[in-house]
Structures are given as structure tokens and as C-alpha cells.
């Protein structure tokens, strides 16, 4: 009995140290990535390991980091129009969108609607595994609060655009722009930016180079939203500092 208790005690001891260590790494990551490029995300690691485990050794999760000044303002506007129109104003969470999603999901459990802001998506993509568990969601909330506290809105959006998945092995807007349009991210047009933003909900299902009717209709909706937000004037009025 004593040996069993001792075993549980040691397990609890090392478990606590492990949790504290992971939290410390996350905190260090938030501080470091406030200034330095993010070399890879948890999503990239997950995709790469998944490919290797299935024998696909040709797969390479690829991203080319670029600063915000080298990203088309249309791309910046497109992701906000598509994913999070209140991004310049909220503190990491869109309470209205969360309430709306909860109400929708209670009525229609077969088609779950999300309400994650760009800040939440950035925290999840950089630091967490994929999934819908309450544990992961709780960690996402804490990490989102951390990056909102330490990073500027401009930094959050810069990281998001550099790690977002746009296709099989294609991460970041620079890699996506060169792969799909043979141009740098700085030269993306409004239509091209809207098309890239249209596949963000599921870039492995929706294709930029072979858009379905749904993707095309979503692209047109995003273009309308970009116009309604005020176009480039919206970015000038919201400096994202």
C-alpha cells in the first residue's frame, strides 16, 4: 500500500512539474514571438507528423515569413471581413458571436458554428493541437488573453497571416500567393485576397486553384463585406497598434 501511495505521489509530483513546464514554455513563446518570426506552428507540426506516420515523406509543411508591410492591404482586409470584423475593437473574444453560435448550435447540432476570433485562431494555431475538447478550449482562452495582453493587434494579424493554412502543405500568405498566383503577397488583388480568405474555414476541403460554387459565392460575399467595411479606409481608420 505504501509503495502504491508513493507511486501516486511521484506521479502527481512529476505531473505538476510537467504542467508548469508547459505553461512556462507557452509564456516564453508569447514573449519571444511578440518580436521574432514564428518558425512553425502546432498545426504545421501536426500536419507534418501526420504525413510521416502515413508514409508521405514528400510532404513538407512550408511557410515563408513576411512582415506586415509586405502583405497586400487587401489580404489584411479580406481576413477581417471573412473571419472577424470586430477584430480592431474586441479584447480577444466576440461575446455577441459566441452567444449567437451557442444559440445556433443548440438548435442545429449537426452543423456546428464556431465563433473564434482571429486572436483565438492565432493562439490555437501557434500553441495548441486541433480538436474540440473543453480542455483545449480552456487553454485557448488563456493563451488568447496572453497574446492580447502582450502583442499588438498588428502583431496578432501578422502572425495569423504567416501561419494560416491555405492548402495542403501551404502555410502563410506569402507561400499561398506564390503557389496559387505566382506573385508575392504584397501584390495580391482584392479578388485574389478574397479567394484565399474564402478557403480558410477548411483549406484541405476547399481549393483555391479549383474553387467550388460555395467557395466562389463565399469569395463574392467577402468582397461585398470588404466594400461595406470601407475598403482601405477601414485599415486607415484602424491602425491595429
From Swiss-Prot:
Pathway the protein acts in: Cell wall biogenesis; peptidoglycan biosynthesis
UniProt EC number: 2.4.99.28
Protein name (record): Biosynthetic peptidoglycan transglycosylase
Gene3D superfamilies: Biosynthetic peptidoglycan transglycosylase-like (1.10.3810.10)
Topology with respect to the bilayer: Single-pass membrane protein
Keyword Transmembrane among record annotations: yes
Family: Belongs to the glycosyltransferase 51 family.
Pfam family membership, one: Transgly
Lineage: Bacteria, Pseudomonadati, Pseudomonadota, Gammaproteobacteria, Enterobacterales
GO molecular function, a single term: peptidoglycan glycosyltransferase activity
Organism encoding this protein: Yersinia pseudotuberculosis serotype O:1b (strain IP 31758)
Amino acid at each position: 500500500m505504501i509503495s502504491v501511495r508513493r507511486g501516486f505521489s511521484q506521479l502527481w509530483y512529476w505531473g505538476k512539474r510537467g504542467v508548469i513546464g508547459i505553461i512556462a514554455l507557452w509564456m516564453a513563446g508569447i514573449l519571444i514571438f511578440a518580436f521574432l518570426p514564428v518558425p512553425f506552428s502546432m498545426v504545421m507540426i501536426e500536419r507534418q507528423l501526420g504525413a510521416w506516420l502515413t508514409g508521405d515523406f514528400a510532404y513538407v509543411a512550408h511557410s515563408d515569413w513576411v512582415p506586415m508591410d509586405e502583405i497586400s492591404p487587401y489580404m489584411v482586409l479580406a481576413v477581417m471581413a471573412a473571419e472577424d470584423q470586430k477584430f480592431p475593437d474586441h479584447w480577444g473574444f466576440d461575446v455577441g458571436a459566441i452567444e449567437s453560435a451557442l444559440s445556433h448550435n443548440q438548435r442545429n447540432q449537426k452543423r456546428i458554428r464556431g465563433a473564434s476570433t482571429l486572436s483565438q485562431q492565432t493562439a490555437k494555431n501557434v500553441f495548441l493541437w486541433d480538436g474540440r475538447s473543453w480542455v483545449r478550449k480552456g487553454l485557448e482562452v488563456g493563451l488568447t488573453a496572453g497574446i492580447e495582453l502582450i502583442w499588438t493587434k498588428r502583431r496578432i494579424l501578422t502572425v495569423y497571416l504567416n501561419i494560416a493554412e491555405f492548402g495542403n502543405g501551404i502555410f502563410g500568405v506569402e507561400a499561398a500567393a506564390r503557389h496559387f498566383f505566382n506573385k508575392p503577397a504584397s501584390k495580391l488583388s482584392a479578388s485574389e485576397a478574397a479567394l484565399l480568405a474564402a478557403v480558410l474555414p477548411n483549406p484541405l476541403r476547399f481549393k483555391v486553384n479549383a474553387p467550388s460554387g460555395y467557395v466562389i459565392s463565399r469569395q463574392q460575399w467577402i468582397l461585398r463585406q470588404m466594400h461595406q467595411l470601407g475598403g482601405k479606409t477601414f485599415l486607415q481608420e484602424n491602425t491595429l497598434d
